């Protein structure tokens, strides 16, 4: 695992966008996340598109979707990613995929999403955030490290965290369809971003704590190519910051970001 510390959320986003842009420029498949953390990264990617970066040969897969929200609902992730990112770049029609949260057979929707990822050749880089309880995607504590895309029940803490987007806790869906930890682990490169002091505990546990299903994000410790980029606030509970900074300052040229 490569841990990179930057001063501000903007610097986190700039580095993340630089990494993502390399994959996009090669027409690779990318995995997208929603939530507040990736927003600055998407803004940076939009700026790179305006400077000439094309997404025309890139296929994208979202991590998750709420069950029961139609695609045009303002809090569906299909709508959110369009509103915040994809409408501003040049993805080809049909190149951005979202789990089908309106399929009454959620088991079928999960299987179809897995098949779509496999048919595209897999995900080359997956952008991730982390919840305050350590969830990635909507893989809540206790999720199997081998799990695939499936129906999940949201943790009460996750529903409370997301209530700000819906206006009230009662409006937050209880169920989601999410890529599993096993699905996420198959991506070639995992790129997790975290900013803010409220993520410091989760960051410390996912990076330096034991690998545990109760801390789903700790699965990154098992991945062959995982990068964690955090700002100073999110890094505040890490014990090995001196080492992480030393590694970052002394990268060989072929490893430089």
Swiss-Prot record:
One of its GO terms (molecular function) is glucosamine-6-phosphate deaminase activity. GO terms for biological process: carbohydrate metabolic process; glucosamine catabolic process; N-acetylglucosamine catabolic process; N-acetylneuraminate catabolic process. Its EC number is 3.5.99.6. Pfam families: Glucosamine_iso. Keywords: Carbohydrate metabolism, Hydrolase. Pathway: Amino-sugar metabolism; N-acetylneuraminate degradation; D-fructose 6-phosphate from N-acetylneuraminate: step 5/5. PROSITE patterns: GLC_GALNAC_ISOMERASE (PS01161). It catalyses: alpha-D-glucosamine 6-phosphate + H2O = beta-D-fructose 6-phosphate + NH4(+). The keyword Cell cycle does not apply. Gene3D superfamilies: 3.40.50.1360. The active site is at 64 (proton acceptor), 133 (for ring-opening step), 135 (proton acceptor), 140 (for ring-opening step). Disulfide bonds: none annotated. The keyword DNA damage does not apply. GO terms for cellular component: cytoplasm. PANTHER family: GLUCOSAMINE-6-PHOSPHATE ISOMERASE (PTHR11280:SF5). Belongs to the glucosamine/galactosamine-6-phosphate isomerase family. NagB subfamily. Catalyzes the reversible isomerization-deamination of glucosamine 6-phosphate (GlcN6P) to form fructose 6-phosphate (Fru6P) and ammonium ion. This is Glucosamine-6-phosphate deaminase. It comes from Corynebacterium urealyticum (strain ATCC 43042 / DSM 7109). The lineage of its organism: Bacteria, Bacillati, Actinomycetota, Actinomycetes, Mycobacteriales.
